């Protein structure tokens, strides 16, 4: 049994901590004051860590929150979303860039989850190759709470991983899927007791480091291409974009963002 990789301790020095041990790269979300909100600065550091790991031929990556975090990540940093008349989740959005980096990284990435995962952080975790979690885990996708139009790529990520009825429940209710239910639905690969999470994840990652890295890299890329291949006519794509535009141009979107920033319940009118 392998010793667990030392957990990072939250500090104000870095939003993300990165380390390598025994062929395993560990990326630790480290912004305790903002509950690991996915700000552009934090996500840029995640991408930089992945780029560094690639040059050092890391065999597997563990993506985790700092030790003791009860919220794995609060999701998008709402303060950075445009308040009206701009696509909040466009192709160049920092989270979208990070998701592409995670999915294209040549080695497996394991999300190790202790605590709750909200909004865009669920998309980040789901874009990892595997999820190992403990009984404290929960997963919620929350655009309905904000009046936010989720992008088509994000919807396709979830449809590629989960049954459509569960995707609808997640998007329509914004209610968290917890522990055993997350395992039952296949959101997580392994659900283990909290006390065993780090050792189990490290042992699991260690097994991968002993396998053929080129074969794994090619299999991962093949699977990415096959699952991403969803031919959509240009006319249909434009129609989907226009539907989203009606949301981010709406009063409801402005109200949802303002209500969140003002820490009050949103009053949606459907306009």
Report each predicted region and the residues it spans.
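C-terminal long alpha-helix characteristic of the crotonase
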Residues: 132-137, 188-238, 267-271
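Terminal low-complexity tails and localization/encapsulation signals of metabolic enzymes
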Residues: 1-14, 258-271
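CoA-thioester-processing core
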Residues: 98, 102, 118-171, 185, ...
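A short acidic, glycine-rich active-site loop
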Residues: 82-94, 242
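Well-ordered beta-strand positions
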Residues: 129-130, 169, 173-175, 181, ...
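A structural preference for short, pocket-lining loop segments at secondary-structure junctions
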Residues: 22-30, 41-86, 101-112, 130, ...
